[in-house]
Amino acid sequence: MNPLELKKAVGSGLLSFPVTHFDNDLKFDEAKYRRHVEWLSGYDAAALFAAGGTGEFFSLNPAEVPQVVQAAKAVAGNTPIISGTGYGTSIAVEIAKSAEKAGADGLLLLPPYLMFAEQEGLIAHVKAVCQSVGIGVIVYNRDNAILNADSIARLTDECPNLIGFKDGVGDVDKVIEITTKLQDRLVYVGGMPTHEVYAQAYFAAGVTTYSSAVFNFVPALAQRFYGALRTGDQATVDEILKGFFFPFVALRNRKKGYAVSIIKAGLRVLGQDPGPVRPPLTDLTPEELAALAQIIETAKAA
């Protein structure tokens, strides 16, 4: 898939990022992961992010990322697979190349590890990754790697395969500046934790797709909510926010790192155990798992 085709695909519908399955020894459980990606592919995601943030990219070593990508590609059918990459520039380039070789249709460039840097340094980082591959790249603005509108415009000029911008910062005024300046030169993706609760504000800012974590365990509900957003069905949007997302977020916010842990827990509730999260994350307690099961059951009954 060439970069322009990927750009069109990403903008065509709802996105998600599968969790990465581990066995009890915390090794990649490829068989379970394949079954999960195959199941998700039946719910019309526009693209899936393999080894993304919810896929515990930060806990995978560089050799595991192409394994995850290859496993996803084997069962995803026509659904594009976008691989995570990141860390320092040399490691990000290494992962990018190996993911492309493994069959990834594109890359999501996560922030470099720990380091805060000036715009020139961030530009050099993104440019190095883009120029190392031929597939499309989406840059993820968040935490310690926040590119401004001028920097993104410059990168778009210098890197033809930079096709997307994903925002995980939440400064809607900055997002509006970027979407207004760049227009259709990029596809714009919402990337806040449980982005559904932010989606209406982002839609108004010109960001009409996002990556849904809960798609992992309630894909039909996630698509119903997204469809209501796209069609302006405010009653359905409000119903799902109040009945599912607000109590879900309250549970997610109980502990640090639960934005990932609670997604794996959701699959566990369904009887599709993805295995534990890797340290330093922690799994939900039995009491929290029961609370999540009640939230899911209530949403299904609505």
From Swiss-Prot:
InterPro entries: Aldolase_TIM (IPR013785), DapA-like (IPR002220), Dehydro-deoxyglucarate_dehyd (IPR017655). GO terms for molecular function: 4-hydroxy-tetrahydrodipicolinate synthase activity; 5-dehydro-4-deoxyglucarate dehydratase activity. It catalyses: 5-dehydro-4-deoxy-D-glucarate + H(+) = 2,5-dioxopentanoate + CO2 + H2O. Keywords: Lyase. CDD domains: KDGDH. It comes from the Bacteria. Its EC number is 4.2.1.41. GO terms for biological process: D-glucarate catabolic process. The keyword Cytoplasm does not apply. Pathway: Carbohydrate acid metabolism; D-glucarate degradation; 2,5-dioxopentanoate from D-glucarate: step 2/2. It holds the Pfam family DHDPS. Belongs to the DapA family. This is Probable 5-dehydro-4-deoxyglucarate dehydratase. It comes from Rhizobium rhizogenes (strain K84 / ATCC BAA-868).
